[in-house]
Amino acid sequence: MTAKTLIVLIGPTGVGKTELSLRIAEYFKTSIISSDSRQLYAELKIGTAAPTPEQLKRVPHYFVGTLQLTDYYSAAQYETEVMSVLEQLFQQHHVVLLTGGSMMYVDAICKGIDDIPTVDAETRELLLHKYDTEGLDNLCAELKLLDPEYYKIVDLKNPKRVIHALEICYMTGKTYTSFRTQQKKERPFHILKIGLTRDRAELYDRINRRVDQMMDEGLLEEARSVYAHRELNSLNTVGYKEIFKYLDGEWDLDFAIEKIKQNSRIYSRKQMTWFKRDEEIRWFHPEQEKEILSYLQASIK
């Protein structure tokens, strides 16, 4: 019997994961699990380059358009739900494909998330109220006092991370750091990681053209439709936050579009830095489809 294998197809934004993922899934007659933390939201289609209705017809997808913007969701929830879906899918397929560029979500499945206590609604509301009334800087100062170790490594510009760490400190009386064991979990399937990469100039050109295409497809209208929710963490996202600056009257539209391109390029560099630390990834150019399929076939057998 062939071992269960999860193919993990990763790479920076704009590299060309979508079409190749469809072709790999069709080749193995299997389903795709998205590991894009923004494609989860039904309202965010254009700005997240979510699979089109035609692409969704070609291959069954999971974790695309399943949430509303106001839904709270975490990488820990994602891990639990994906593991449950994988258990079902592996009863029908010996190979399943996971693809996307959200580094934390990929790691949640490949390595696992630490068992951190579930935050109660009262604590969550308290800290969200503090964030709204006192601002992020005050919360960062509080985190420095309660968990100086995590304060040194957390992205202090990311309110969701800062708030979550404080929630755990408030609720348990312990540091958030004390729950972060970062021990890799054993998985009941084999994991094969394929990384896609391009020459930087080639990737940047693709990113720039993709942003232009998103604008042609109606990104401005999509951003306008969710503008009322602009304070949500789910919309602190490249492509939306820049358009909001235009809608606020701070930037003109051409400048906002250039900032989307620039911030997308910066994000692609961050993704590559994260992925390059993983020695399990086998790297290919997206056009090396034949080589990728040969490698997968040999590795799965």
UniProtKB/Swiss-Prot annotation:
Disulfide-bond pairs as recorded: none
InterPro entries from the UniProt entry: Dimethylallyltransferase (IPR039657), IPT (IPR018022), P-loop_NTPase (IPR027417)
Gene3D superfamilies, alphabetized: 1.10.20.140, P-loop containing nucleotide triphosphate hydrolases
List of residues binding substrate: T13, G14, V15, G16, K17, T18
Enzyme class of the recorded protein, top EC level: transferase
Catalytic activity annotation: adenosine(37) in tRNA + dimethylallyl diphosphate = N(6)-dimethylallyladenosine(37) in tRNA + diphosphate
Site keyed Interaction with substrate tRNA: positions: S102, R124
Pfam family, one: IPPT
Binding of ATP, residues: G11, P12, T13, G14, V15, G16, K17, T18
Biological process annotations from GO: tRNA modification
SUPFAM superfamilies assigned: P-loop containing nucleoside triphosphate hydrolases (SSF52540)
HAMAP family named among the record's database cross-references: IPP_trans
Subunit structure: Monomer.
Protein's recorded name: tRNA dimethylallyltransferase 1
Gene it is expressed from: miaA1
